[in-house]
């Protein structure tokens, strides 16, 4: 290891209390982008991050206004959270790396089943974990880029690259209007960017680090069933009116079977066929059904073989039903017939699926199923947001640098993986900036992002920051841009 990285690593270790403090302050802000009533908190978190950037010596900090959020929304003239752009360094002799992250988080409430308050960071050094909403997705990794700059400065070592940040506040709600900003700034603020690095995904399992070169996309839909003009008493009207909730259950139940097979005609034909060369890539990846069971806390896997699990997680589409808006969901018993219900579901997309064609197939299927019910209610299905799938080259300069950095920190070569989740903006960065995108995960596969008791292992937090630092150093030394 070079002397410079040794010094930086030592500072990452010694500055850990400062980094814990920064993360604690960030986690306590409930920046839930999907909750319109909490939009001011998303703005508060943007301000906090901007202040942290300024204190750490970043310059040219811009809080880019994205305007008003488009429908469907309940709050008129709802402002979108800003995108935070900033720079650290502007040396033309150095390579420029853009780092992306998001400061918004998923909804979380104690009554959802959390062991602790979700917006109060719990640091359990005895167990070696930190727990809180956003700690792994994506507040912890986002702040780590700032922490790495602090560690280089404290060590007295020269920062190896020019760093550009692009931190958004709507990733959990479709990254609205970020595409347009990136395309607009491709020859502006982002001009000269040599590589893009994103730390917003996870190790495949819990033991071995990975580098990720592909993601599924995500099309999110809602089916709306509308009946009576107001909610009704089931004792008076049950059995004599067509209930929207019953219709909705029929429509949602027709989308996918209990084995995960999507039942919408035409989807299978859009999926790129599996080649023998691609199939061979799965053989050497370290993963087992036991790791999947550990990550889910159950034995509910639909597949027994490693290859089948990974292919259905990475390279085949899936359909998930997420919930129903407008229906009773609190504790206790309420005998109401809801007048209007919104069934939420999404499809994870893969090469070579086309979003417009997929939406057409989904709407056609839902309309046909509803028509078969002969219900007097009204039904429509609409796309809420979509994000494209993405695949990169795992053998280019920055993947090579990241591989070397991972080996230095963790002592093993990382697995090269694709991922089942979606970061819609990856493809936009790749195409608009005409550059490579690397996914450099910090957290483990059992972190529980989007779930209760979201956590990040302290060893991954510290090791992740060291990997980020070494990646930037090694990439700066690579012979090609």
UniProtKB/Swiss-Prot annotation:
| Keywords assigned | Cytoplasm, Dipeptidase, Hydrolase, Manganese, Metal-binding, Metalloprotease, Mitochondrion, Phosphoprotein, Protease, Zinc
Q: Where in the cell is it found?
A: Cytoplasm; Mitochondrion
Residues holding Zn(2+) 2? 102, 137, 200
- Write one Gene Ontology MF term: metal ion binding
Q: EC no.?
A: 3.4.13.-
Provide one Gene Ontology biological process annotation.
glutathione catabolic process
Q: Does the keyword Cytoplasm apply?
A: yes
A cellular component term from Gene Ontology for this protein is: mitochondrion
Top-level enzyme category: hydrolase
State the name under which the record lists this protein.
Answer: Cys-Gly metallodipeptidase DUG1
């Amino acid at each position: 290891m070079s002397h410079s990285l040794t010094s930086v690593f030592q500072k990452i270790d010694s500055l850990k209390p400062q980094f814990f403090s920064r993360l604690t302050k960030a986690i306590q802000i409930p920046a839930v982008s999907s909750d319109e009533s909490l939009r001011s908190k998303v703005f508060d978190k943007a301000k906090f991050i901007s202040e942290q950037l300024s204190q750490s010596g970043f310059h040219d900090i811009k809080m880019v206004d994205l305007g008003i959020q488009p429908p469907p929304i309940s709050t008129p003239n709802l402002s979108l959270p800003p995108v935070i752009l900033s720079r650290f360094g502007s040396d033309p002799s150095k390579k420029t790396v853009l780092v992306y992250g998001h400061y918004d988080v998923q909804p979380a409430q104690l009554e959802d089943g959390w062991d602790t308050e979700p917006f109060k960071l719990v640091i359990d050094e005895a167990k070696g974990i930190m727990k809180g909403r956003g700690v792994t997705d994506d507040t912890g990794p986002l702040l780590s880029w700032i922490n790495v700059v602090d560690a280089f400065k404290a060590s007295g070592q020269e920062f190896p690259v020019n760093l550009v940040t692009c931190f958004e506040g709507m990733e959990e709600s479709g990254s609205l209007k970020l595409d347009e900003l990136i395309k607009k700034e491709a020859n502006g603020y982002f001009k000269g960017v040599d590589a893009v690095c994103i730390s917003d995904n996870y190790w495949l399992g819990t033991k071995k680090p990975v580098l990720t070169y592909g993601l599924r996309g995500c099309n999110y839909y809602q089916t709306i069933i509308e009946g009576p003009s107001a909610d009704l008493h089931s004792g008076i009207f049950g059995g004599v009116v067509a209930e929207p909730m019953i219709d909705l259950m029929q429509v949602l139940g027709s989308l996918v079977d209990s084995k995960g097979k999507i039942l919408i005609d035409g989807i299978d034909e859009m999926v790129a066929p599996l080649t023998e060369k691609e199939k061979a890539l799965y053989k050497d990846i370290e993963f087992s059904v036991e790791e999947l069971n550990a990550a889910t806390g159950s034995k509910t896997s639909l597949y027994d073989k490693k290859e089948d699990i990974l292919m259905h997680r990475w390279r085949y589409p899936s359909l998930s039903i997420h919930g129903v808006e407008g229906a009773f969901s609190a504790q206790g018993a309420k005998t109401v017939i809801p007048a209007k219900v919104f069934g939420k579901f999404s499809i994870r997309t893969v090469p070579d699926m086309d979003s417009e064609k997929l939406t057409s197939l989904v709407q056609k299927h839902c309309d046909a199923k509803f028509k078969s019910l002969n219900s007097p209610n009204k039904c429509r299905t609409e796309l809420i947001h979509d994000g494209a799938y993405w695949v990169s080259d795992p053998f280019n300069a920055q993947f090579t640098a990241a591989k070397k950095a991972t080996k230095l920190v963790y002592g093993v070569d990382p697995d090269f993986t694709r991922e089942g989740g979606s970061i819609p903006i990856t493809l936009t960065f790749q195409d608009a900036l005409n550059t490579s995108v690397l996914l450099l995960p910090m957290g483990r596969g059992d972190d529980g992002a989007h779930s209760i008791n979201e956590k990040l292992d302290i060893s991954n937090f510290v090791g992740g920051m060291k990997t980020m630092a070494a990646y930037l150093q090694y990439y700066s030394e690579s012979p090609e841009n």
